[in-house]
Amino acid sequence: MKRIQKGFTLIELMIVVAVIAILSAIAIAAYQQYLKEAQIAKIVSHYDDGIRAMRAELAKRAAQLSSGRKDLVVLNETFVIDEILNPEGRATAPLGGPAYLPGDADPEIGAIGIRITGGNRAGTEVVRIARPAFLEDVTAESVVIYANSAR
């Protein structure tokens, strides 16, 4: 009479564990690459959105000034970040913290820097938007937008 085997042998279990380990290693590597690409996309998106929003705001203000409006205030970094670029406060940098910072960009967390210089009256501001070097794939870049031309 032949004995009926119940369960799995040790070698079968070891093979299953080895296959799961190999699949896990591949999945983790792919997930890490996915996270890196998502962080890069986020920083590029914040930078491009900031440029578009500032150009639109400066063009709007230039039109208001040319139509005779005199009550516009001079822009500052805090106003630009809180009211124009991130009014709901939801935008975050890839590694946490705010997406936009007054002053210089922060390469540690991937935050975009906003610096406003220039005139002491509305319509003469110069806005510099800076993207930090982030990870090894994003190079530092900045754009300067002049309020009197919104270019």
Regions found by a protein language model. Name each.
Residues 2-35:
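N-terminal single-pass transmembrane signal-anchor helix
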Residues 18, 37, 52-55, 143:
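A ubiquitous, low-specificity "background" feature that marks scattered single residues
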Residues 59-151:
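Periplasmic/extracellular, small/polar-rich flexible segments of pilin-like filament-forming proteins
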